[in-house]
Amino acid sequence: MLKNDRLLRALQRDTVDRTPIWLMRQAGRYLPEYRAVRQHAGSFLKMAKTPELACEITLQPLHRFPLDAAILFSDILMIPDAMGLELHFIEGEGPRLGKPIRDAAAITQLAVPDMETELRYVMDAVRLIRKELDNSVPLIGFSGSPWTLACYMIEGGSSKEYAHIKAMAFNAPDVLHQLLNTVTNAVISYLAAQRAAGAQALQVFDTWGGILSPTMYRTFSLPYLTRIARELERGTGTERTPLVLFGKGNGPYIAELAMSGTEAVGVDWTIELEDAARRSNGQVALQGNLDPATLYGTPNNIAHEVQRTLDSYAAGNGGSREGHVFNLGHGMTPGMDPDHVSALVEAVQRLSRR
């Protein structure tokens, strides 16, 4: 039995003694101990593909901060890599895929990878982390969203214009839907395998959904997020594994996401939580949404923004703080001070206590 189940209870909108907190990219380059492991390992991919290293990095922030969850150390591009698109990282430029998808012929060659062969290292990491956590806090597994993965798979890496995928959306929408369906099948299998290996909550990162117009979002992102929420087997009752659908720029679609079948919606800092709570109408828990740049401020400024965020959620949720998981609106960045993270966690725990 979990010693700390605040996160799981909050994601189900159950009563908790205080608002739980975890942070996107809580294990990362802002931590000197992470940088030490990275230097010794020699590459990001070696860390992500070595279960013992992935476990060590996952646990690093838990040794520093009294967080309410661990999140698997991995990368959303492990699925495209397992599909044969040859993931590699270029220093200063980020991830690159050596075989980008540009036509229907390339899509027909893609297959959903076997989760216990091509992606066994991920499942082994999940199993090892669960063992090392020893039921102290829940472990969150994750995947990229179909749209976000398709962006990388078609562009071949990060992009400013997303010209290739947007051209496909306008000129060959059927081809893009073919790719999105294949990727959605892979995401569902990937999340199910993480759950079977021991993940106790799951999150989908729709990082690039916000680049789409409303019509395009409702065509190429939302339907596939909904498929995941409705088709991913997560159990029932108190044994149900909660799902969080997080998206940058998803504020206009919160009401629709709340009806998707997910347990929770993660939001960025470009919408007030009060507005997000009103739009979700009590159908889902909400996760977020402190501007990550707040961590560059003083501890007093951080505490002020924590209070404002907590109050904003309650104002849109009938005065109640139930159903809220505190998080950033996006991930930690390398220049952040671990002491300011300590100040953030302390402020959330102190100010949200019921």
From Swiss-Prot:
The keyword Lyase appears for this protein: yes
Enzymatic reactions: uroporphyrinogen III + 4 H(+) = coproporphyrinogen III + 4 CO2
Location(s), subcellular: Cytoplasm
Pfam families documented for this protein: URO-D
Record-linked InterPro entries: UROD/MetE-like_sf, Uroporphyrinogen_deCO2ase_HemE, Uroporphyrinogen_deCOase
UniProt-listed Enzyme Commission number(s): 4.1.1.37
SUPFAM superfamilies per record: UROD/MetE-like
Superkingdom of the organism of origin: Bacteria
Entry-linked CDD domains: URO-D
Enzyme class label: lyase
Keywords: Cytoplasm, Decarboxylase, Lyase, Porphyrin biosynthesis
GO cellular component: cytosol
Subunit structure as annotated in this protein's UniProt entry: Homodimer.
Protein name listed in UniProt: Uroporphyrinogen decarboxylase
Species annotation: Xylella fastidiosa (strain 9a5c)
